[in-house]
Amino acid sequence: MTLMVRVITPDRTVWDAPSEEVILPATSGQLGILTGHAPLLTAIGNGVMRVKADGKWLAIAVMGGFAEVENNEVTVLVNRAERGEKVDKAAAQALLDEASKVLNTSSDKQERLQAKLDQQRARALIQAAEMGSKTGS
């Protein structure tokens, strides 16, 4: 038996396929989902979700949203998502560097808040890219 996993953003579907296992970056911590999991609704933070399909792990950077688990279906609705192998690592590193610079120099609360969010996003993208470049289980 498998899980049907969907990762959906406002403008596209990032993943829609049968999978064996999912690890979600819930706001309360990492959450593992296998077949037969109890129904669940949880908030998703900025981080990397991992999907095991055909015996291999896939990393997807996700940016805030919700996940629902019911009847061996996992639906992840997030603001943004990017598969690890499609991440532009140089652009993500540039975003991280710029956000760190703003945090070190700005005293404006709004700028600092946005920089913290950008840092989280960049770190998730970089982590997904690094995981996406690895093979195996």
Swiss-Prot record:
Compartments, as annotated in UniProt: Cellular thylakoid membrane
A GO CC term attached to the entry: plasma membrane-derived thylakoid membrane
Gene3D superfamilies hit by this protein: F0F1 ATP synthase delta/epsilon subunit, N-terminal (2.60.15.10)
Pfam family, one: ATP-synt_DE_N
Keyword tags: ATP synthesis, CF(1), Hydrogen ion transport, Ion transport, Membrane, Thylakoid, Transport
SUPFAM superfamilies reported for this sequence: Epsilon subunit of F1F0-ATP synthase N-terminal domain
Major place of residence: membrane
GO molecular function, one term: proton-transporting ATP synthase activity, rotational mechanism
InterPro entries to which the protein is assigned, alphabetical: ATP_synth_F1_dsu/esu, ATP_synth_F1_dsu/esu_N, ATPsynth_dsu/esu_N
Transport keyword on record: yes
Membrane topology: Peripheral membrane protein
Keyword Magnesium: no
Record function comment: Produces ATP from ADP in the presence of a proton gradient across the membrane.
Family, as annotated: Belongs to the ATPase epsilon chain family.
Subunit annotation: F-type ATPases have 2 components, CF(1) - the catalytic core - and CF(0) - the membrane proton channel. CF(1) has five subunits: alpha(3), beta(3), gamma(1), delta(1), epsilon(1). CF(0) has three main subunits: a, b and c.
Protein name according to UniProt: ATP synthase epsilon chain
Species, as recorded: Synechococcus sp. (strain JA-2-3B'a(2-13)) (Cyanobacteria bacterium Yellowstone B-Prime)
